[in-house]
């Protein structure tokens, strides 16, 4: 189906959090004292290609627990398989053109404040599947222009924005040749089950946001997605 620019929705009653019965965040579940064994985003691990060839014996599938302390640029096809990724505040992951970034059963989260999220360059691809969870992002996934997205069985929790399509600003000098495409968008959950980091009652702003673009989203026969307060 085709999704067009967002329309105003009636405001719902903000959720009331019970501090004594809040579910555990990914940080509480998976963040041990001290450092994770792998530190990405440093000078020698700034690019996915550095990780693949210098740390991972040429394999583009990485498994392990990661502290992402600086920006990670996905400059060649790269998969995080069953990884726990603890991300420093204000850090982002950027996927370059003509590259595929896959999250397969991985958990991405921030323990203080918020991380920026995953930025998709023109003609890039992101695949998320197998109970991947993305938490604590300003915008968990953002595609200002042409990108391909396959999102299945993924939980977006406690993000300010879950997925943003299009460009929130003046129309670019070069318009996008095609609009963002979801090849799959099924079985996902969007929720905010505890206050946003750094707040006592802050909640997600929007789950899927569309600006000044059209977007093709899945098929009518796809499994349902769940949107919760």
Predicted regions and their residues:
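Extracellular beta-helix/beta-solenoid repeat scaffolds
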Residues: 57-202
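N-terminal targeting or signal-anchor segments and their processing/structural boundaries
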Residues: 6-15, 27, 54, 161, ...
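Boundary/junction segments of secreted and surface-exposed precursor proteins
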Residues: 5-56
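Intrinsic disorder/low-complexity signature
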Residues: 15-18, 35, 127, 150, ...
């Amino acid at each position: 189906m085709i999704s067009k620019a967002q329309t105003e929705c009636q405001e719902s009653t903000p959720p009331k959090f019970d501090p004594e019965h809040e579910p555990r965040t990914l940080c509480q579940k998976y963040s041990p004292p001290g450092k994770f064994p792998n530190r990405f985003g440093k000078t020698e691990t700034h690019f996915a290609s550095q990780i693949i060839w210098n740390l991972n014996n040429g394999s583009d599938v990485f498994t392990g627990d990661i502290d992402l302390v600086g920006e990670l640029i996905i400059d060649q096809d790269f998969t995080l398989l069953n990884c726990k990724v603890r991300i420093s505040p204000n850090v982002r992951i950027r996927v370059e053109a003509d590259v595929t970034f896959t999250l397969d059963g991985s958990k991405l989260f921030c323990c203080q404040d918020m991380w920026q999220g995953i930025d998709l360059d023109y003609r890039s691809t992101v695949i998320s599947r197998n109970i991947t969870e993305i938490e604590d992002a300003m915008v968990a996934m953002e595609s200002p222009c042409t990108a391909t997205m396959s999102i299945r069985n993924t939980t977006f929790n406690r993000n300010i924005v879950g997925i943003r399509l299009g460009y929130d600003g003046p129309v670019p000098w070069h318009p996008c040749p095609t609009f963002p495409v979801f090849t799959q968008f099924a079985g996902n959950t969007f929720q905010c089950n505890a206050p946003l980091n750094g707040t006592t009652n802050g909640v997600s702003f929007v789950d899927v946001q569309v600006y000044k673009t059209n977007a093709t989203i899945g098929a009518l026969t796809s499994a349902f997605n769940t949107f919760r307060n």
